[in-house]
């Protein structure tokens, strides 16, 4: 049996990183498909088109979608937003702007419609609003594809990769700062201990 490259499978997915398939994102789902551990009908945002393409690529029978999903983008009721940043942390493509204790807003052209921002909102001020675009996000700056479906997916993938790199960089900087502070505290304690011994 021929193994299909994971990237070939991932390329067919919409790159929303929505987790509707039960996996942590599009690439983990592609890995599971490649390993024969997942059915081809789990990608709700991809719909029938993606499921048929996956079935064709993997040489599997077409299965009806396990779930369906209406194309929608997040909309924050800015008058109800308390600025908790829970939605910002949840967004896998950095499509939400705001700061702690200030009003947040969705950059609708960048929203993939994943819906991951809705559940963590403590004041229930985020709605998913149906849109007519067949492929999200509507922004396409980070794509070279002429086909709208793949252009949207490439753009979303690029945004996700940038988001992931930023988070890793922020985490590394935070750990380095904590290590510096810890080293400074230990050095101060050692100096105080030496001073007490000398006295």
Predicted regions and their residues:
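N-terminal glycine-rich anion-binding loops that anchor highly charged ligand groups
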Residues: 19-29
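Amphipathic alpha-helical segments that form the core helices of the histone-fold
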Residues: 28-37
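Ferredoxin-like iron-sulfur electron-transfer modules
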Residues: 6-15, 37-45, 62-83, 88-89, ...
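Flanking helices and flexible, charged tails adjoining ferredoxin-like Fe-S electron-transfer domains
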Residues: 110, 116-199
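A short, flexible low-complexity segment enriched in Lys/Arg and Gly/Pro that occurs
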Residues: 1-4
